[in-house]
């Protein structure tokens, strides 16, 4: 596994400042403590980096709600048991890398103590152009918190500058070889941390999508791997709802539909379906430009609708889509119905 010493050495080589190495040197976890590991690491992060003012600022930007309440309410109000949780983190502005780690741990902590007995499995994706050099730092802290390493998809196309010999060793093995609770991919991209929570006992939905805005595209092979891994954990008798996430330039949707037809033939899908066609960028100019892009072509919409014609869009689909996009700045939004399928097209930006 990644050690404190190996991370500190990498941080020194990349000249990113001594504070992360200092923190790792001072990090002490007590397995015999009544306080959970995740809380121990969170507390030390908060103290060492003095994150109090920054968490307060994050709270202020969210109507002064306490951070723990924001996380708890977001989950409890979400009406499906698989959550894509997006935190807008200003890596280049006023929020620090340590604070992002704190939020990761806090989110896991909130779900772990929820009344709904979660979480059980995570598929964690860290996408940010500034997290590459801190990837091992983040991975180590999560290891300390929950006792499992993050692994990449073998097919993940990570930018060359993020590669290290140790990281490459991790991706040479079989995709999702680690059966611990956390697995994921570090890539380039805009300012966000995305959680895909696949809860093996209670999940009713799976999220499928390409994230080209963050330079990470889930290949068809990865898509199949994710589905097979999911069913290996939940059992093939469990049916799930389906949320298709596409974007304006998604050329792989037809291949994904072919894979979904296989699942349908195995009677693995429920009737509910949501389709969101999105194009979220980091700036308003690009978002306004994307507003003129048609989105899913008509023939592709027909393919989607034809495949999903026996399924239905839940009555609260609009509300769920709104919760998915969260506080994105929307420049263009259109929803239309093809048969009984509701498709939302959204173009916007993160401020």
Curated annotation (Swiss-Prot):
It is found in: Cytoplasm. Pfam families: PpPFK_gamma-like_C. It comes from the Eukaryota. GO terms for biological process: glycolytic process. This is ATP-dependent 6-phosphofructokinase subunit gamma. Structural subunit of pyrophosphate--fructose 6-phosphate 1-phosphotransferase. Not required for catalytic activity. Fine-tunes allosteric regulation of the ATP-PFK by ATP, fructose 2,6-bisphosphate and AMP. This subunit is only found in some Pichia species. InterPro entries: PpPFK_gamma_sf. Keywords: Cytoplasm, Glycolysis. One of its GO terms (cellular component) is cytoplasm. Disruption phenotype: Decreased growth on nutrient limitation and reduced cell flocculation compared to wild-type. The keyword Lipid metabolism does not apply. Signal peptide: none annotated. Heterododecamer of 4 alpha, 4 beta and 4 gamma chains. The gamma chain bridges the N-terminal halves of the alpha and beta subunits. Pathway: Carbohydrate degradation; glycolysis; D-glyceraldehyde 3-phosphate and glycerone phosphate from D-glucose: step 3/4.
């Amino acid at each position: 596994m990644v050690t404190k010493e190996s991370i500190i050495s990498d941080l020194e080589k990349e000249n990113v400042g001594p504070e992360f190495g200092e923190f790792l040197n001072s990090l002490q976890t007590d397995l015999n403590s009544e306080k959970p590991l995740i809380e121990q690491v969170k507390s030390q992060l908060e103290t060492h980096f003095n994150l109090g003012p920054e968490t307060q600022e994050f709270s202020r930007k969210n109507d002064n709600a306490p951070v723990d309440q924001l996380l708890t309410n977001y989950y409890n109000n979400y009406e499906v048991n698989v959550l894509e949780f997006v935190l807008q983190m200003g890596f280049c502005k006023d929020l620090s890398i340590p604070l992002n780690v704190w939020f990761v741990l806090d989110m896991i902590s909130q779900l772990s103590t929820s009344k709904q007995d979660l979480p059980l499995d995570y598929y964690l994706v860290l996408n940010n152009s500034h997290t590459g050099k801190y990837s091992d730092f983040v991975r180590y802290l999560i290891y300390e918190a929950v006792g499992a390493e993050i692994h990449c998809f073998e097919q993940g196309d990570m930018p060359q500058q993020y590669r290290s010999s140790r990281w490459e060793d991790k991706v040479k093995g079989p995709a999702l070889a680690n059966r611990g609770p956390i697995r994921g991919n570090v890539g380039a991209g805009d300012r966000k941390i995305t959680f895909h929570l696949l809860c093996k006992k209670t999940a009713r939905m799976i999220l499928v999508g390409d994230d080209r805005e963050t330079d990470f595209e889930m290949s068809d092979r990865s898509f199949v791997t994710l589905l097979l891994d999911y069913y290996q954990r939940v059992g093939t008798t469990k049916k799930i709802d389906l949320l298709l996430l596409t974007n304006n330039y998604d050329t792989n949707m037809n291949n994904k539909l072919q894979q979904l037809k296989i699942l349908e033939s195995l009677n693995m899908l429920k009737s509910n379906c949501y389709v969101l066609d999105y194009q979220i960028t980091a700036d308003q100019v690009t978002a306004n430009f994307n507003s003129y892009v048609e989105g899913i072509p008509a023939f592709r919409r027909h393919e989607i609708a034809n495949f999903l014609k026996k399924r239905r869009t839940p009555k609260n689909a609009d509300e769920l889509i709104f919760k998915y996009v969260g506080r994105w700045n929307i420049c263009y939004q259109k929803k239309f119905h093809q048969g009984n399928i509701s498709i939302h097209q959204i173009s916007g930006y993160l401020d």
